[in-house]
Amino acid sequence: MDRVELHDVEYGDCTVLVGQNRQILMVDCGSVSRYARRGEEEIDRRFNEIFSRYAPAAQRQFLLTHYHRDHMSGFLKQVKKDPGYFDRVYLPALPCDKRGVNPVLEFAVFAHFFAVPQSDFAQVNTTCLRIFDALNDSVGADRIFTLGGGDIFTFDGAFYEVLSPARNEPFPFDAILTEAVENLNICLSSPFHTGRETEFLETKDAFVRLYMQCQTAFAPSDRATPGRRRILLDSLRDLLGRMEDMRSNLAHSPAAPDIQDILNQSVVRNVYTETQNDLSLVFHNRRSRGPSNLDILMTGDVSDEVLRRISGKLFDGYYIVKAPHHGTESHFSNVIGDLAVAHLLISNGDYHAGGEISQRYIDMECIKHCTNAGACRWRDIAGGCCNRLQRCYEQPASGSLTLKCAAAAGERRTPCNIYVFVCAVVRRFDDIRG
């Protein structure tokens, strides 16, 4: 890995690992914001500039940590506009509970077919249902890969290991979500229904089972044959289409109001959203020797609970750590705070429901690289960056204050090889190479 580039997409995420051989791995690309506040231009323009920057790359890979708008909206628009842009796309595999039930998929199906249309895209996001179909029509089935805990993938000649969520182990889902899913199924299970409720339940169950088979068939290891993958995708599309055909009938079902009552409970919606966060792909590099400046930990939007569960798999320290969930206090973890971290990446922005950057990250003895200071109370109070009195050991005079960084004097190349793009115009891919 040659460098890491962090892009300001307001309240969203877009982190790009740039390889030595003109390869890139883009981890997430999305935002809940409509505008990039500094210039008030539409956020789509920012996405276009980002994708234009990496157009000259020899190979472009994309990894989606989880199915939330602030991590995938730009990506979905790009693959629709330019299906061949990414050579490989990694998707998160959604795990089951100890009973073999996948409550996230189950809830998503009910929300997709019964919920009243919402303006808040991130609240009950059901993109996971159509992701295989959408990417099959755009990037093509051969470029789709699913990842789960224990899987290994490669980038720029190095191996990266997925730490969470485990692919073959039950996930400890919140009881609020599992009970909600049970109640949703009960609503359609009455023998007194005279519509297509029973048919919908059977089709839904078949869809979820087939979806799980697709996740296995598209894994990096034990990958199914192209013919088998094509059959699975065609069957998945057929089942989704059959449920769509039942939509108007289901809208008049006596069970519909009860189902909508469950879906509209704020506590249930919030748990579903936080569960999606906790199912983020967490990954790090595999060391070939000892610690190095190639050590990186990417955390998606996971909570402290998830990080504590996988803490035994983490290194004692990392050169780069991506702060989970935009560096907010709600997702701060002492697991991160106790690591020896050289550089911390924080992607935050202007969003009323987002949250400020945690003071506990600011207190960490590492260099913080932030896309947007608008959510930083420290900067508002102190009138400057918390890095001013930090020492950077990547500078030629090791341990010099960050104020003496060559990049601060206008040099194109930073000693740490970490770049934050916050301006409206993003330079071309080759402009930073030393």
Q: How would you name each of these model-derived features?
A:
Residues 324, 328-341, 345-434:
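C-terminal regions of proteins
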Residues 2, 77, 81-295, 384-434:
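Flexible, acidic/histidine-containing loops and adjacent segments that form or flank the divalent-metal
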Residues 37-50, 75, 107-133, 306, ...:
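Well-ordered, non-membrane alpha-helical segments in soluble/globular domains
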